[in-house]
């Protein structure tokens, strides 16, 4: 079978089949134009990596259901799902999570969920902006951080497993380079929660594989977001082998790959995205 006669799902095509490009991005976009739109649930979508991820998936034709503690901002978030597919939720509130899952399920209305991206995370600082270490972090802060960074991904995955099964979907957990080393700025609770999320990713990959659901993680290093000051960037860049910080768009592209058919045999992985900082 020649390449021109293949549809991009790997089966022999015909003249009536849509002309789907080889790369996963254009393939999804073409399928969406022909009525086969994929759906993504994305937490922490209002800024940084989450915002870049929502934008990329939207450009590829996906329907985006977003979750964040902020109301939907149509000026900053240029995806057509908009307010109708946004769930405003405070993930540190244990009573709010089941309500958020129920609202997402209602909006899915029994349709398949192709990807769940657990991106939301918090990293509290001391009142003076300094790092909270294992001696100075209050118990309430430990509980809040673990609720958002670890428990929320567990509950979203458990609550949406039936919809993920329908699509043989993909889950991507956003961990961090700080889960494997002490960081000068990230607090102890944040770092520990990200290490736990990496471990959880392996556990989930094992448990969800029976349903055809893949579970992976990405571990960003220093990424240029609103919270990274020029002074901090100047401090960090020289110690990174590529001598620069990354961009949210670069992280979003790896997330997209992990949610695509191109990564159909990848599960249980944690992909470092840090310019070689881990080596």
Q: What does each model-identified segment do?
A:
Residues 1-36:
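N-terminal structured subdomain of primase-like DNA metabolism proteins
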Residues 168, 209, 214, 266-268:
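Short, small/polar-rich loop/turn modules that mediate ligand/substrate recognition or access, typified
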Residues 181, 256, 267-279:
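Short C-terminal tail/terminal secondary-structure segment
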Residues 46-47:
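Conserved glycine-rich cofactor-binding loop
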Residues 127-143, 236:
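Substrate-binding pocket helix/loop in short-chain dehydrogenase/reductase
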Residues 162, 206-207, 264:
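Alpha-helical segment proximal to the catalytic Tyr-Lys
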Residues 157, 193, 201:
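Active-site helix of classical SDR
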């Amino acid at each position: 079978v020649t390449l021109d006669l293949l549809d991009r799902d790997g089966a022999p095509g015909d003249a009536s089949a849509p002309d789907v490009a080889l790369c996963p991005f254009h393939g999804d976009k073409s399928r969406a134009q022909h009525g086969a739109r994929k759906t993504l649930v994305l937490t922490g979508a209002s800024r940084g990596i989450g915002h870049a991820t929502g934008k990329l998936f939207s450009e590829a034709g996906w329907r985006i259901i977003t979750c964040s503690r902020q109301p939907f901002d149509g000026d900053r978030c240029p995806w057509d799902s908009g307010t109708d597919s946004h769930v405003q939720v405070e993930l540190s509130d244990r009573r709010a999570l089941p309500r958020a899952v129920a609202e997402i399920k209602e909006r899915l209305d029994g349709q398949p969920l192709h990807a769940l991206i657990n991106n939301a995370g918090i990293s509290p600082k001391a009142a003076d902006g300094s790092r909270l270490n294992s001696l100075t972090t209050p118990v309430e802060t430990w509980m809040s951080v673990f609720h958002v960074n670890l428990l929320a991904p567990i509950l979203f995955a458990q609550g949406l497993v039936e919809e993920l099964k329908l699509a043989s979907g993909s889950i991507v957990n956003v961990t961090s380079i700080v889960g494997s080393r002490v960081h000068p700025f990230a607090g102890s609770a944040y770092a520990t929660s990200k290490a736990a999320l990496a471990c959880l990713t392996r556990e989930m990959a094992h448990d969800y594989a029976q349903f055809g659901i893949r579970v992976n993680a990405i571990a960003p290093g220093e990424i240029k977001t609103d919270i990274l000051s020029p002074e901090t960037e100047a401090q960090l860049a020289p110690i990174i082998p590529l001598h620069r910080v990354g961009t949210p768009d670069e992280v979003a592209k790896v997330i997209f790959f992990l949610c695509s058919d191109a990564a159909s045999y990848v599960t249980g992985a944690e992909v470092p995205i840090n310019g070689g900082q881990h080596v």
